[in-house]
Amino acid sequence: DKIIKISLPNKYKKANNERILDIAIGKMYEQIAKVEVERAMEKTRILLGFAPEDYEIRKMNEELGRCEENKITISPEIVKYDREVIDYIVLHEYCHLKYKSHCKSYIKMLEKYEPNYKKYERFVANI
């Protein structure tokens, strides 16, 4: 497991540390997500030859990714996982730009670009 150590300035040590840590970790995830999601989006754009009209990184309650109306939304929580998982989630959402449901054509496209998609599906389902 990876360990992240956060040191707070002395003036915050007696305050509500849990809330401060939640905010700090959230901001850290957002900053890392911006870099990692941008990397994965560009990689997938080059691989597939198309891109969404827009994408955003926004905290979501349960989902790590979503595709609606030619826009992909990715949760900053995605950075808790390996790059392979991030790449898979972005690819998964890209495939939804072409196919809204998990129809046979969608699965065929997903499998074409990620032959091990079932491994990642199982992993994401257990998050």
Identify the meaning behind each predicted range.
Residues 1-88, 97-127:
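Active-site-proximal or metal-binding-adjacent scaffold patches in catalytic folds
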Residues 93:
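Walker B catalytic acidic pair
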